[in-house]
Amino acid sequence: MYRIKNENLDFKIDSLGECKQNNPLIDFYASEGSSHFVNEKNKIKFSVYRNEDKGDRYEDVLLEKAGPREKIYFVPRHVKAAITTCGGLCPGFNDVIRSIVRTLWKIYGVRNIYGVKFGYQGLLPESNSPFINLNPDVVDDINKFGGTILGSSRGGIKPVEIVDTLERMNINMIFNIGGDGTQKGSLLIAEEIEKRNLKIAVVGIPKTVDNDFMFVQKSFGFETAVEQAVAAVAGAHFEANSAYNGIGLVKVMGRDSGFIAAHTALSSNDVNFCLIPELDFDIEGPNGFLVHLERRLLEKESLEEIPHAVILIAEGAGQKYFDHFPKKKDDSGNLLYEDIGLYIKDKITEYFKAKNIQFTLKYIDPSYIIRSSPANASDSLYCARLGSNAVHAAMAGKTKMLISLWSTKFVHIPIKMAVIDRNKVNPNGSFWRDVLSSTGQPISMKN
């Protein structure tokens, strides 16, 4: 759900300078008898939607197509590339690292590729972690494992000190794999580089298991997360459907956006209540969640079925119930949310005990299992494409940008646009309508 005015859409990509070097792929394509280079004039339309009555207000908004350029900025043998992985874990971290390394090494002939340990922290002077020399052998099978071989951390965004390190190590391109905070850090690093008139390309690969980046059709790891969450919901459903008034409560990731919860609900078809941050709801009261939960159980019993219910809640839902709590932030500056899952669990318990209604409640929080999982086949393929396109962009001197999938095409997006806001589920859109149709929950649970 995008809320940015047309006049504020600026997708111009910064470049370090004129590209004069021949791309090593020229020889490969020559042997193939064809050329697959991207022309700088090749653009992707921002919007494929058109209202014949009103016209297309995004008609002139175009995105730069990703892919290899015939002329590149850097001389491959002079390249020293660095890779960071930052923030929370996400399925596909290792797949992206592998793709970047293999593309640099096998396509461009780059031999100086460094893995930075523990995110931005590893670029600070006080870091005791030396860079890791990366090559195709080192990353050969890392895609089979969850987590990141480089380690990760939050915070550490000190642009001056980080650029000091990049300059001292003669790094001339850096790939930052991370979420909103990481990419905001990338932008600060790129701006410090610009101040010093250094020729260092800063390219981001957007990582958010919540799928909440602006102008990114799909974040890597998201499909794996939904797949794992569906398995957790299935377990909750089996538990709930095996007990009288059985209730399965599952909490999944989704701080500000409920994409994982919504996609999981629609994928599983076992969810009866899906609670997301985008929609306010009341727990108690005549039209509150608890009343509707009780009604669901009674209706099932009247149909001579096993009365049961499955509730799926995103971690950022219902945070209004903690407004009186002191606010805390993590090292990346993100607001730390209270556990709405446990809160709802306690409220359900209080409600049914007060009414002397027999029930069984199972609470499942698969968050850390989900985010530490290896990428599934679809995400692994996607990560490979993201990594290779990130390398093509950096070699062409593109900077202050990240790789995105948009209208099924890989494109370049300025980092400043990707972090301008959060992508959210549209509660008035067709997708959420389908979720409501699947769960059968009321359109509103507000008193």
From Swiss-Prot:
A molecular function GO annotation: 6-phosphofructokinase activity
Pathway field: Carbohydrate degradation; glycolysis; D-glyceraldehyde 3-phosphate and glycerone phosphate from D-glucose: step 3/4
Catalyzed reactions: beta-D-fructose 6-phosphate + ATP = beta-D-fructose 1,6-bisphosphate + ADP + H(+)
Cellular compartment(s): Cytoplasm
EC number: 2.7.1.11
A Pfam family annotated for this UniProt entry: PFK
GO biological process: fructose 6-phosphate metabolic process
Main location: cytoplasm
Cofactor(s) required, per the database record: Mg(2+)
Residues involved in ATP binding: G88, R154, G155, G179, D180, G181, T182
Example of a GO cellular component annotation carried by this entry: cytosol
Residues involved in Mg(2+) binding: D180
Gene3D superfamilies: 3.40.50.450
Residues annotated as catalytic: D210
Ligand binding (substrate): T208, V209, D210, M253, G254, R255, E315, Y368, I369, I370, R371
Family matches, as NCBIfam families: PRK06830.1
Function: Catalyzes the phosphorylation of D-fructose 6-phosphate to fructose 1,6-bisphosphate by ATP, the first committing step of glycolysis.
PANTHER family documented for this protein: ATP-DEPENDENT 6-PHOSPHOFRUCTOKINASE 1 (PTHR45770)
Record-stated family: Belongs to the phosphofructokinase type A (PFKA) family. PPi-dependent PFK group II subfamily. Atypical ATP-dependent clade 'X' sub-subfamily.
Subunit structure: Homodimer.
Protein name listed in UniProt: ATP-dependent 6-phosphofructokinase
Lineage start: Bacteria, Pseudomonadati, Spirochaetota, Spirochaetia, Spirochaetales
Protein's gene: pfkA
